[in-house]
Amino acid sequence: VKDELAILQRISGANPKHHGWNFVRKLIDCFTVHGPKAEHQCTVFEALREPLWLYRRRFVGNVIPPDILKILLQMILEGLDYLHSECHVIHTGTGKASAVNHTAADSNADLKTDNIMIRFEDPAIPQEVAHDEYNEPLAQKRLNDGRVIYLSRNDFGPLRKPTGVVRITDFDRAVLGTGAQSGCIQADVYRAPESILDAGYSYPADIWNLGVMV
């Protein structure tokens, strides 16, 4: 957790004047919740609408039109340029995974449609959703120990504008690019050549991931 917070703080404040700063998720705050059995580190981020894989379902054939895709790709590339040139951060990382024990869960480290998020195109939407939840709350499950599990809202209605602004998210496995990194990254069939050859990887691994995603 400490390593992730350090990465997030670096991303949030490296250079807000860089245009790509607008296309990465920034840390707003962090705090610790003391529970009956453990402490929980909590992080606060901007509320976002939906991941790119869900966003593309809004278009015919689940395909983002080329004119919109070009705009989104420009944002993603500018966000990656900010991460690489200003923050010296590689999104693709191994975290605690090893070259031998690479699991499906480790793919969270890869740049993909799950962690490219679309911002709310209208700042009024979260307020409207909160109002709806207050008046007509979704299903809740109350446990015997008094805790309540709330059903998440993941449908915020039709888009009010066709093109959203992207945010690159999920930096829990990100690593610093100040030196060559090693280890097994990415899913087997999409793995970058340098990783296959165990030759170490750096910023180009993120660009490879973007190409695979597209």
Sequence positions of predicted segments:
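Intrinsically disordered, low-complexity regulatory segments of kinases
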Residues: V1-V214
